[in-house]
A protein has these predicted regions:
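Amphipathic alpha-helical core segments of compact helical bundles
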Residues: 17, 199, 230, 348-356, ...
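Short, amphipathic C-terminal "tail helix"
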Residues: 444-479
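Strongly charged, low-complexity linkers/loops
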Residues: 362-373, 386-456
Length: 479
């Protein structure tokens, strides 16, 4: 609706990829029986003391570095006090006064160009337990309680559901690239609280904020934003007043519904966590962690275009998943200069088809970059033809091995002997007189049919280019 500005901010909670919980040694294995991965610390027993997970600190700092944040070399934990069944000790250990990471941002690509979405801060905390509701009762599963959770708080700089999606997808890609989280939405690894407000154009102050809690699917976030923006615009355009409140998304109804009103910011009565010492990081430690960072996906796309001569679309598809880009680059380097597009074609057609059919990732299949590079070399050297290579690829994908060994063992080498090929061509012409007559009548497609017959006679081993040339020459003699 013209005349109004939309403002969106996101608070994204990301479960970090650690083996154990934030303040105890309990396992984080997903899918285990309820309330089995627990101990006195994560259950909040009196007198149980937390011990900080160093790996969680490292992964949070690495995330901040990937996102261009300033790292707070002295960081502290605080107690966020609230009473709710999902936090048995009645407070959450979080960071409020001195979070680990400050500033930074995510660059998104929109149809109108690039836009930088600024981040306010990233803090580290423990996750709450999971409340499971049934028809007659609710239960609390404390397996999740204490999971290392990184909260990435954006500035209110998003102005549409499309921008919110671009931000979340870019953020997810960067974090997965860095190896700090799986960002598996189905397992709850990535969840967002969404803040939306509307205000008249020209008004500096933001409108009244409405928060939608704990959204765990991109599709749901997009739909909730669309609905809530329309609801708020409809209200203010008819003289209504937006109430500051927390709402939930009801996917089955396709609408947001009130949970609780918030006349003022909720008072969590933060105070410094007395059982944990501050995190003190040296410059050397921060730089050591910086050295572990991968290349940003956006930078990798640009570099691969320049280094391997592949188009922007190919680079975007390949760089979308780090393991795919790693595989492509390894194979392209083995193939040598000028073969980037060839390797890209193989990966984006045949290999991605096999990945889709099997539901595997490239790291889960048996195909290696060395095998793909050798397959490309065999085709380029005319030791085998394209159809034979495509027949070999599924076996290499499923069972591994090297294509040269398979070609030798099965006698699949390409037939390029002129005399042998000429005999095949003569046989095809002799057995298909109608095609010869069609060619004489000007139907050039008849030559292609005869080439196919030669390939069939040679069991796919004939060199296609030589066959095409021979067929054309033999037909010309008969015109």
């Amino acid at each position: 609706m013209s005349g109004y500005l939309i403002t969106i901010g996101l608070e994204t909670h990301v479960q970090l990829k650690t083996r154990t919980k934030m303040f105890c040694g309990c396992s984080l294995a997903f899918g285990t029986e309820s309330n089995t991965n627990v101990c006195p610390v994560c259950l909040g027993y009196p007198g149980a003391l937390p011990v900080m997970n160093r790996e969680a600190v490292k992964l949070t700092v690495m995330s901040g570095l990937m996102l261009g944040c300033e790292i707070n070399r002295v960081s502290t934990f605080d107690r966020k006090n609230y009473f709710y069944p999902d936090m048995s000790k009645d407070y959450q250990i979080s960071q409020q006064a001195k979070p680990l990471c400050l500033g930074g941002g995510v660059t998104i690509q929109m149809p109108e160009g690039q836009k930088r979405i600024r981040i306010n801060h990233i803090h580290l905390e423990e996750d709450a337990a999971k409340i499971n509701h049934s028809a007659r009762f609710s239960g609390v599963d404390f397996n999740r309680c204490g999971t290392p959770l990184m909260e990435i708080v954006s500035e209110p700089g998003l102005s549409s559901p499309e921008e919110a999606m671009a931000y979340l997808q870019s953020l997810k890609q960067i974090l997965v690239y860095a190896g700090v989280s799986d960002c598996n939405l189905e397992e709850g690894n990535m969840r967002s609280d969404v803040n939306i407000s509307v205000r008249p154009e020209g008004q500096e102050a933001l409108g009244t904020k409405v928060e939608i809690k704990n959204m765990n699917t991109f599709k749901g976030i997009y739909a909730a934003l669309e609905y809530e923006i329309a609801r708020q615009l409809g209200a203010v355009s008819h003289g209504g007043v937006i109430v500051q409140e927390t709402r939930r998304w009801e996917a089955e109804l396709g609408e947001t519904q009130p949970m609780r009103t918030k006349e003022n910011a909720h008072d969590y009565r933060y105070f410094p966590e007395p059982d944990l010492v501050p995190i003190v990081l040296s410059a050397e430690q921060v730089e050591a962690w910086r050295a572990l960072l991968p290349e940003l996906p956006s930078m990798r796309r640009v570099r691969m275009m320049a280094e391997y001569g592949i188009p922007e679309y190919d680079a975007g598809v390949l760089a979308d998943a780090k393991e795919n880009a790693d595989f492509f680059e390894a194979a392209a380097r083995l193939c040598g200069q000028g073969q980037g597009k060839t390797v890209s074609n193989w990966f984006m057609t045949e290999i991605m088809r096999l990945l889709s059919e099997t539901g595997k990732t490239i790291t889960q299949c048996a195909l290696t970059p060395e095998a793909l590079a050798e397959l490309v070399a065999l085709v380029n050297g005319r030791a085998i033809n394209g159809p034979t290579a495509k027949e070999l690829l599924p076996e290499l994908f499923n069972n591994g091995g090297m294509p040269g060994v398979l070609v030798h063992a099965r006698g699949l080498g390409q037939v390029s002997d002129a005399g042998t090929l000429e005999a095949f061509v003569e046989q095809a012409i002799r057995e298909n007189p109608k095609s010869v007559e069609d060619y004489k009548a000007g139907k050039k497609a008849a030559a292609g049919f005869l080439v196919g017959q030669v390939m069939k006679l040679s069991h796919g081993k004939a060199a296609p280019q030589q066959v095409g040339k021979l067929v054309t020459e033999k037909l010309a003699e008969r015109v």
